[in-house]
């Protein structure tokens, strides 16, 4: 989920395993030769997308594809499927039963049959990032659409790099004041670096960072117990992944840095009816992922 957001960076890492698998045998090993998918078990620790730190273990379906003009990454999560801490609500304990994020990009070069490359910019896309949290009531629902321009960069190095810049339209946002309006921008950086062969698999380093700014949330009238703004107009989430990929199995360790995670002000003093607490929206969290490609 957004709470994991291995997101599109995992696309490139998984592609290495599919390529390796294809070389091993001419028999098809996967259900599709272009729609690549996996089922994952994800354990998260100290994620900071809400006002309270969250730990949980959940089930995830993940898919990516790149065919002609279509570039896709997406996942669907069943939150807290295998349990979590007291603040983690999900499918079995009256929380959201489903969280989804998709990142479709459509090649402008290929759709217009025009070579728009120049300098290090290889290809241009109409880029999208849509996030949906089903929830069970208004306080658990999110629907956010980022839309804008994306590009792939030729670095001249054995790595891949892509950049996307978006404007954001916010529908539901857990009851926040910025619902049903245009509200800010996002700049996304994603990169992939193959490292080495290890234990019969392929070890890679993957990174992606979301820079969010320009939101109205930091100016609303939601104040903490000390009279300070409880929300912010900006946030950063920066993920750093070591991924070990095989033909079918893959394993990842993720370190993620949050700054104003979920646009919550760090150290804000709040009380939602279960006692006072301090928001810890800035700091490190982590994930461990085990998945099967099919």
Curated annotation (Swiss-Prot):
Subcellular location: Cell outer membrane
Stored Gene3D superfamilies: Nucleoside-specific channel-forming protein, Tsx-like
GO biological process entries: monoatomic ion transport
Keywords: Cell outer membrane, Ion transport, Membrane, Porin, Signal, Transmembrane, Transmembrane beta strand, Transport
Membrane-related topology note: Multi-pass membrane protein
Function: Functions as a substrate-specific channel for nucleosides and deoxynucleosides. Also functions in albicidin uptake and as receptor for colicin K. Also is a receptor for several Tsx-specific bacteriophages.
Cross-referenced Pfam families: Channel_Tsx
GO molecular function, one term: nucleoside transmembrane transporter activity
InterPro entries: Channel_Tsx (IPR003055), Channel_Tsx-like (IPR018013), Channel_Tsx-like_sf (IPR036777)
Protein name: Nucleoside-specific channel-forming protein Tsx
Annotated family: Belongs to the nucleoside-specific channel-forming outer membrane porin (Tsx) (TC 1.B.10) family.
GO cellular component terms, semicolon-separated: cell outer membrane; pore complex
UniProt gene name: tsx
Principal location class: membrane
Entry keyword annotation includes NADP: no
Signal peptide start-end: 1-22
